[in-house]
Amino acid sequence: MAGGSKNSNFYLSGSYYNQDGIIPNTGYEKATFRFNGEQKWRMLTFGANVAYSQANTDKTLTSAGLYGSSGSGTMTGVYRWSPTDDMKHYLNEDGTRYRMFGDRLDVVDERDNPYWILNKNKLKDNTERFTGNFSIKADIADWWWISYRMGIDSYTTDDSKTLAAGGVYKLAWQKGMYSENSYRYKYLSTNLMMNFNKQFGDFNFNLMLGTSTDDTRTWTNYRMAWNFEIPDFYAFDNATNDNRDFSSSRSQKRLIGTFGEFRADWKNTVFLTVSGRNDWSSTLPIENRSYFYPSVSGSIVFTEFLPKIDWLSFGKVRASWARVGKDTSPYSLETALWPSQSFLGGLTGVSNYWTAGNAALKPEITESTELGIELRFFNNRLKLDYAYYTNNSYNQIMSPRLSNATGYILRSVNAGDVYNKGMELSIGGTPIQTKDWTWESTINVSGNRGTVKNLLEGVEILYVTDVQVGNAKAASFPNGNFMAISGSEWKRDDQGRVVLDKNGLPTKGTNANLEIGNREPTFSGGWNNTITYKGLSLNMLWDFRVGGHVYNGTEYAMTLAGVSEFSANREKIEVSGVNTNGEFVTNTFEANKTYTYNGKETSGKTIIALSLIHISEPTRRVVIS
């Protein structure tokens, strides 16, 4: 609904969205309401924008265990389930969970049935969000205006997780687990600006000055209970104090900034922009909380200075340099205390938080440059845009792992400079343009190379996450690739041949943290095409990525479970390499024979199973193309 008059207008809308997920028992539902309005009175213009939404999500754990429970998600369960066993058979007649291996394995070593996860384990969340802003603008003169804007972004997310008793979890959760987490976020901002714009002959000048204030607050309340006294009754009062965990936290951050921008152009042909901003952050030390970052950019439409050329319609060169500052998260300067998880004589105390504070933190600084050219040919039927850029970050704030002797696990520090450089090329045009038909086509190609330098002394590898599959991790190596993969490789001799152990199986190298791959592609891009016939348009987009490595975690998990194509041959396996005597040999293990393994007679079936697991451990490289 919309309406208005000469001096006012408004817009009111509502929407409802409901989608069932591809995975059974999952879905997403969202309702949204929005209002925009504006009223002019003399030299003043008042504006308001308000939006409210509520979203509900039914989810499922797809891949990883929850809270280190040793369980798995639906997709992991699918990958690992035996193809000869009916996956839909997840309940016994008495309602207990069907176990593929019966009582032959501990419950934590069993396979998690995907249908059990979908029907018994419930993950839900509800999010209510309110955003709004109010603005007032005063047009003091045709070349001078002042505006003030105040805004809010507030939302609350409540999520719950229910794990039914008897699943593939750690033993403490065999009688079930239930958790609730409430996260509240509130962001308040104000912005005061004034703008001057004047034309002097062929020159146009624009000056903008302003100040802003940002206030961010969060509240978190978390509750968890497990090992319930009454079966299938998931409530916090149904668990003893030893089987409950409650916690809460809150944070506040404030950022104040002043900024300015000067723009000038001559005959809409030569352009210059200079800007600067200074921020004061509450999350940095007093001596470092003020940081300034400027930028400058310019461009020239050089075809305006050339005689008319039929085949060249437009040409522009551009260049820019910018610096951007960044603060850190709240409470990174001091070491926090939190309640100890251990009790002594019925009493508890406080201990240091696992992340050590650092009162000497500096802001992160990122500097970027760009040189580019834009060309259009044959009356704009063919277009080309090329750019070369650098993007370097200094004094990155990170939290590397510390020695256990320090009493902490992590510490916030300034360490590591990241250097990126790359190119982007876009070629587009209109190959066909008739009265009824139009075909527009654009291809974009880009490539980036990132390296990391100046890591903290003693930090040989920078891990961006603690998550790993097998022995593979996302990592950055000093003076090496920023988006590398770390892992281990086979131990090899001087000729590059795999070294076998006394049992005839491959051995790992002594270094388990080698750079075994680079996640960064050689180049990537897209090809977009739009075909139009008498107002009817069809759009097609192809994305491509060439080069780079990924770790095939899916195949790794399936091989360990014995259900991958790699592990299909269970009757015989051949392993080639150099034995302990330095001789190149090929060892063959057959399922129907007995071998000596670690000094004991062992079935060939066991040897083959161990070999498949052993061989699957090192990272395997996969090139995306």
Predicted feature residues:
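Glycine-rich, aromatic-lined ligand/substrate-binding cores of catalytic
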Residues: 519-551
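Short glycine/threonine-rich loop-to-helix capping motif typified by GTGT followed
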Residues: 286-290
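Extended, hydrophobic alpha-helical segments in both membrane/secreted and soluble proteins
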Residues: 33, 190, 258-262, 270-280, ...
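Surface-exposed loop/interface segments of Gram-negative outer-membrane beta-barrel transport/assembly proteins
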Residues: 22-23, 32-129, 149-256, 283-285, ...
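Outer-membrane beta-barrel translocator/receptor signature
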Residues: 1-33, 41-44, 130
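A generic beta-sheet turn/junction motif
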Residues: 3-7, 16, 39-43, 198-202, ...
